[in-house]
C-alpha cells in the first residue's frame, strides 16, 4: 500500500491524540508510550522525506491468486468503511499468533500431541490471517486511505507472522523429533522472506512467483488438517520407496522451495540493481543485506551446535521465537531501508539477545542456558515491539494520520 491517508492533528497539538489513533492519552497511556518508544526517533528527516516520495511497485502473480481474488473482493465488501486497513491486518496477525501459541503451550518440544481442536484452531487462524492480510490493501483503496505506513505495517506483520507460521507447521508434523530438520525449516522460512525484501531493496519492485505466500499458506493449512485426521501415526508412517517418515516430506518440500525461490531472488539481486553501477535502490552494495541475516543464522547455528545442555533440542519453540523476533526486526529495517532509500547499518540492538546466549556459552554456561534463553526471548520481543511502535508513531505523526483509525476528512490522492 502506498499514497497518503486522511490528515489528522499531530500528537501534542491543542487536542493531543495518540499516534495510534485511540484518542486522548491517559497517564497510563503516556507511560506505556514512553516505555515502548525509542528515546530518539528511528528515522531521520531525510528518510521521512524520501518515504513520502515512495511508490509501491510489484510484479507477477501467484498460481492461486486469480482464484482467490473473487473471495477477497467479496470479503472486503463485508468490512465497514470506518475500519482502518492496519486494524484489519493487526487483528489477523493477533489471531494467527494466539492460535500458534496454543500449539506451543501443548507442544513445547514439538514432539507432543496437541488436542485436535488446537490444530483446527491453528488452521483457521492461518486462513483468517491470509484473508485479512489480502484485503487490507483493498480496504485502503476502497476508503482512499493508502499510505507508505500501510505498506510498511503490512510487511512488518508478515515478517512476524512468518515466524509463527513456520513454527506452528513444525509442531503440527512433530518435527521436534528431528531437530536438524526443524532448525532448517524454521530458518529457511525466515531467510526466504528476508530475501524477498532483499531483492526488492535491490530492484525497487516486489516480485511474486508462481508458487508464493498464498500457495504455501494453503499447503500449511492442509498439513494442520492432516494432523487432525491422521495424528502422530500419519506423520510417523514410512513413505514407500523413499523409506523416510511422512513428516520429512514437508521438510523436503521446504528444501525444494528454498532452492527454487532463492535462485530467482539471487538472479535479481546480482543483476537487477537499479542504483548506480547496479547497486541497490539506496546506492549501496547489493550484498550488504546478507551481513544481517547471515549473522542471525550463523549465531543461531553456532549456539545450537555448541550447547552443552541441548538447548535447541529441549526448547525448540522458545529458541525459534527468540531468533525469529531478531529476524523480524532486521527484516523490518530492510523494508524501511527500501522505502526510505537508505543504508542498512549492521550494529543493532537486535543482536543483544543472541550475543547473551553466545557469551554465556563462551564462559562455560556461567548462567543456566535456559534462563539466558528466556532473557534473550523477552529482550528480543521487547526490542522488536519498541522499534515497530516507534517507527509507526513517527511516520503517522509525519504524515498526519492515525495507525489504527481512519479520520474523516478531505481524502488525499491514491498512489496504489
UniProtKB/Swiss-Prot annotation:
Ubiquitously expressed. Its EC number is 2.7.8.1, 2.7.8.2, 2.7.8.22. Changing residue 215 to A/D: Induces a strong reduction in enzyme activity without altering diacylglycerol specificity. The modification Phosphothreonine is found at residue 40. Mg(2+) 2 binds at residues 133, 154, 158. It is an enzyme of class 2 (transferase). The chain crosses the membrane at residues 89-108, 116-133, 156-176, 180-199, 210-230, 246-267, 286-306, 315-334, 349-363, 368-388. Changing residue 212 to A: Decreased cholinephosphotransferase activity. The modification Phosphoserine is found at residue 18. One of its GO terms (biological process) is phosphatidylcholine biosynthetic process. One of its GO terms (cellular component) is membrane. It is found in: Endoplasmic reticulum membrane; Nucleus membrane. Homodimer. This is Choline/ethanolaminephosphotransferase 1. The gene is CEPT1.
Amino acid at each position: 500500500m502506498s499514497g497518503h491517508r486522511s490528515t489528522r492533528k499531530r500528537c501534542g497539538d491543542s487536542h493531543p491524540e495518540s499516534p495510534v489513533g485511540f484518542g486522548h492519552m491517559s497517564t497510563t497511556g503516556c507511560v506505556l508510550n514512553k516505555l515502548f518508544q525509542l528515546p530518539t526517533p528511528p528515522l531521520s528527516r531525510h528518510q521521512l522525506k524520501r518515504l513520502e516520495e515512495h511508490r509501491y511497485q510489484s510484479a507477477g502473480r501467484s498460481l492461486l491468486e486469480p482464484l482467490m481474488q473473487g473471495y477477497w473482493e467479496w470479503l472486503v465488501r463485508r468490512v465497514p468503511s470506518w475500519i482502518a486497513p492496519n486494524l484489519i491486518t493487526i487483528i489477523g496477525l493477533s489471531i494467527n499468533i494466539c492460535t500458534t501459541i496454543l500449539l506451543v503451550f501443548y507442544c513445547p518440544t514439538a514432539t507432543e500431541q496437541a488436542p485436535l481442536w488446537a490444530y483446527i484452531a491453528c488452521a483457521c487462524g492461518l486462513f483468517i490471517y491470509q484473508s485479512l492480510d489480502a484485503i487490507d490493501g483493498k480496504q485502503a483503496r476502497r476508503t482512499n486511505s493508502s499510505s507508505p505506513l500501510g505498506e510498511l505495517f503490512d510487511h512488518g506483520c508478515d515478517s512476524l507472522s512468518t515466524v509463527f507460521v513456520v513454527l506452528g507447521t513444525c509442531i503440527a508434523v512433530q518435527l521436534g523429533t528431528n531437530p536438524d530438520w526443524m532448525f532448517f525449516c524454521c530458518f529457511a522460512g525466515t531467510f526466504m522472506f528476508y530475501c524477498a525484501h532483499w531483492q526488492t531493496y535491490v530492484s525497487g519492485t516486489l516480485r511474486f512467483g508462481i508458487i508464493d505466500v498464498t500457495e504455501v499458506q494453503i499447503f500449511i493449512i492442509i498439513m494442520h488438517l492432516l494432523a487432525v485426521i491422521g495424528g502422530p501415526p500419519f506423520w510417523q508412517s514410512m513413505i514407500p520407496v523413499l523409506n523416510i517418515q511422512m513428516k520429512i516430506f514437508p521438510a523436503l518440500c521446504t528444501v525444494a522451495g528454498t532452492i527454487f525461490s532463492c535462485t530467482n531472488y539471487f538472479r535479481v539481486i546480482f543483476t537487477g540493481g537499479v542504483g548506480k553501477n547496479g547497486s541497490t535502490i539506496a546506492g549501496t552494495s547489493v550484498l550488504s543485506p546478507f551481513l544481517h541475516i547471515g549473522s542471525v543464522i550463523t549465531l543461531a547455528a553456532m549456539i545450537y551446535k555448541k550447547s552443552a545442555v541441548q538447548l535447541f533440542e529441549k526448547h525448540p519453540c522458545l529458541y525459534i521465537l527468540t531468533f525469529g523476533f531478531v529476524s523480524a526486526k532486521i527484516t523490518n529495517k530492510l523494508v524501511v531501508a527500501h522505502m526510505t532509500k537508505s543504508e542498512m547499518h549492521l550494529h543493532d540492538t537486535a543482536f543483544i539477545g543472541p550475543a547473551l546466549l553466545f557469551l554465556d556459552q563462551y564462559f562455560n554456561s556461567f548462567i543456566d542456558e535456559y534462563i539466558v534463553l528466556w532473557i534473550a526471548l523477552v529482550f528480543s520481543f521487547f526490542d522488536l515491539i519498541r522499534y515497530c511502535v516507534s517507527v509507526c508513531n513517527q511516520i503517522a505523526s509525519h504524515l498526519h494520520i492515525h495507525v489504527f483509525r481512519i479520520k474523516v476528512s478531505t481524502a488525499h490522492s491514491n498512489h496504489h
